[in-house]
Regions:
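Long, hydrophobic, well-ordered secondary-structure blocks that form the structural core
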Residues: 77-100, 105
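A gly/proline- and charged-residue-enriched helix-loop-helix capping module
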Residues: 102-125
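A short glycine/small-residue-enriched secondary-structure motif
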Residues: 33-48
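Glycine-rich, proline-tolerant flexible connector loops at the mouths of alpha/beta enzymes
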Residues: 6-22, 218
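Histidine-acidic metal/acid-base catalytic patches
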Residues: 29, 46-51, 55-61, 66-76, ...
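Glycine-rich, histidine-containing beta strand-loop boundary motifs that form or position
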Residues: 7, 37-39, 77-82, 210
């Protein structure tokens, strides 16, 4: 009966008041459900960049953790993906059984980067075959389809940016000049240095969502994409409130990730899970797949099994359940 939701109407970096949280709880409860996990409390670009209003935003984030805890909500998902958060190129990809799902195609994303975003040097990230296919794809789109394609990438999927235009994305990208993976990891550590003590005080957990897709995009570093990233993160901030939202869909989209190995190695840090399966193709594209399917020989029934084991363990002074959401 539990659900994952967020207060999407509140601007990034602002405080979630007890009143707003309670109002959403009441709405959820009116359907016989319980809001027990936040997905997500967004981390502002200022925090990721440690510029502008980042100090105020961090203080507001701490207060939001306190206010959520006061309302009994202690599972908090967040991500540290720069600029565009989650990325897909097709929000209505049709499967053979007639159902629809989400898809990422590197050729289509190349068309976005090169012809719409016009990112300098984007061509260097693609093969000649991909560049030729991207040009052909872009030329196949008329004006309306081009605009719809642009919006599907920058303003529709879960990392909704509330009406950004392509020029805004260019300005956001420019702010990351000189920010490499090492520096972004330092910014994540400094953010966690501030918020984890508050989470510990109230028995809350901060669960980072893996990068989706789990590889660099737009020339930007992604720092929660592979096992070594999480090893570094937990070593830098060993607090028991520092956890992962183990998203099988995001992680499996990177063929460098060994999902069973990561599940076994990180199980002490897994407090929340997204049980999704992904079909990865040789051309680098991937799409959502039914969760009863197999990926690379991995039986996803092992994840609920690990969930049951986790429920038997005591963490932060009490038993905690590993949460799951419907596939998406």
């Amino acid at each position: 009966k539990s659900v994952f939701t967020s207060l999407h109407q509140i601007s990034y970096g602002e405080v979630w008041s007890v009143e707003d949280i309670a109002a959403r709880q009441e709405k959820v409860a009116s359907y016989g459900l319980e809001w027990d996990t936040v997905e997500s409390v967004p981390v502002s670009e200022d925090i990721k960049l440690r510029s502008g209003d980042f100090e105020r935003h961090i203080e507001n984030y701490k207060q939001t953790i306190r206010n959520l805890a006061a309302c009994g909500i202690k599972n908090i998902i967040y991500n540290f993906m720069p600029v565009l958060d989650w990325i897909r190129t097709d929000l209505h990809y049709r499967l053979p059984d007639g159902s629809r799902c989400l898809r990422f195609d590197p050729v289509q994303f190349a068309a976005f980067e090169i012809y719409l975003l016009k990112r300098e040097g984007a061509e260097k990230n693609y093969t000649q075959a991909q560049l030729e296919a991207a040009e052909k794809f872009f030329e196949s789109l008329d004006g309306d389809k081009r605009k719809a394609f642009e919006r599907s990438i920058i303003d529709v999927f879960p990392g909704c940016k509330m009406g950004l235009e392509i020029g805004d994305v260019r300005k956001m990208l420019a702010k990351y000049d000189g920010i490499d993976a090492a520096k972004l990891k330092t910014h994540l550590k400094l953010f966690l240095d501030e918020v984890l003590p508050v989470a510990e005080e109230f028995g809350s957990v901060m669960a980072i969502h893996p990068d989706d897709p789990p590889f660099d995009v737009l020339g930007l570093p992604r720092i929660a994409s592979r096992f070594s990233d999480f090893q570094e993160m937990f070593a830098a901030n060993p607090s028991r409130s520092n956890t992962i939202c183990f998203c099988t869909g995001s992680l499996s989209a990177g063929l460098h990730n060994d999902i069973p190995q990561m599940l076994d190695a990180l199980r002490e840090r897994i407090y929340i899970a997204h049980l999704r399966s992904t079909q990865v193709n040789l051309d680098g594209s991937f799409y959502e797949r039914k969760t009863d399917d197999f990926l690379l020989g991995y039986d996803y029934s092992r994840v609920p099994e690990a969930s049951w084991e986790k429920q038997q363990m005591k963490n932060i002074g009490r038993k905690r359940a590993l949460c799951a959401i419907p596939p998406r």
